[in-house]
Amino acid sequence: MGNFPAPKNDLILRAAKGEKVERPPCWIMRQAGRYLPEYHEVKNNRDFFQTCRDAEIASEITIQPVRRYRGLIDAAIIFSDILVIPQAMGMRVEMLEGKGPHFPEPLRNPEDLQTVLDYKVDVLKELDWAFKAITMTRIKLDGEVPLFGFCGGPWTLMVYMTEGGGSRLFRFAKQWINMYPELSHKLLQKITDVAVEFLSQQVVAGAQILQVFESWGGELSSVDFDEFSLPYLRQIAERVPKRLQELGIMEQIPMIVFAKGSWYALDKLCCSGFDVVSLDWSWDPREAVKINKNRVTLQGNLDPGVMYGSKEVITKKVKQMIEAFGGGKSRYIVNFGHGTHPFMDPDVIKFFLEECHRIGSK
């Protein structure tokens, strides 16, 4: 993995591997981004994907929360987006201010799909900027905290590629899996193949831990999740370590899966090959701990909306959460149940992190 500085804080790596820790490690999904004033200063008037593709700027944005919350955050996550995989597969993606992602030419029929299936993806070439940003960030961090790489889950990426953006009804994605199940599997397989290579090359570039965001997992029924999501998540968990060995990386790289809303699948996710399963806030942690039976590390799961509450409420909710996950000295990573919001107060986030340290160290 190159001549990178040795980690000074490996708390999250140890927790992910199931080792005992002094306190639960803390990081937050979307910890780098729009709620930080320094993000807006650096991004300036650049387009979102233009920002991601500038390695120097992406690296700076990645490090901003680590710098602001020095000693409180136990990992950095590279500033990027799950939709870079569809881009690498030849699809055009725009990020519309205030509206979110938009695909001008979504996949709506078998002919559209064939174009994507026939497209030869060169991951190293298409996503070269991402690997440069990771390497640059890993060097700049100087071992202060480990660096996350990530990608979107295959089903979630298929949703965006077929819907043309976010959705409430999931009309087109559901149409695909119900009208063209075989073609849907072909698309999911191609996305999976690209995801495996992308994640593996992120590790080569310097990522020390990986997360797969299956953000739309909860939009599938349990039966459809078992057919259109879980097998591809399992493939990723199984194939990435093998690909890393082919690339000369023998050390264990912890992998996290976050299938938001997929409450019915927790037992299966705990034996899917991932080291960590991340939970959204709909879960009662005590129930999740029972179902898990100590097989994997659990991550989560504070409702991000708690950040709009008083300090007393934040303290109470953090205490409840850490205690419900067993105290945090083993098999637990503190996080939100989803990402930060643009409207959050950075000082409130700091208080949350301080309370996680204070309560988790007891």
UniProtKB/Swiss-Prot annotation:
Coproporphyrinogen III binds at residues 30, 32, 34, 81, 160, 215, 338. SUPFAM superfamilies: UROD/MetE-like. It is found in: Nucleus; Cytoplasm. Pathway: Porphyrin-containing compound metabolism; protoporphyrin-IX biosynthesis; coproporphyrinogen-III from 5-aminolevulinate: step 4/4. It catalyses: uroporphyrinogen III + 4 H(+) = coproporphyrinogen III + 4 CO2; uroporphyrinogen I + 4 H(+) = coproporphyrinogen I + 4 CO2. Keywords: Cytoplasm, Decarboxylase, Heme biosynthesis, Isopeptide bond, Lyase, Nucleus, Porphyrin biosynthesis, Ubl conjugation. It holds the Pfam family URO-D. GO terms for cellular component: cytoplasm; cytosol; nucleus. Its EC number is 4.1.1.37. The record marks 81 as: Transition state stabilizer. Present with 9220 molecules/cell in log phase SD medium. Monomer. PANTHER family: METHYLTETRAHYDROFOLATE:HOMOCYSTEINE METHYLTRANSFERASE RELATED, UROPORPHYRINOGEN DECARBOXYLASE. This is Uroporphyrinogen decarboxylase. The gene is HEM12.
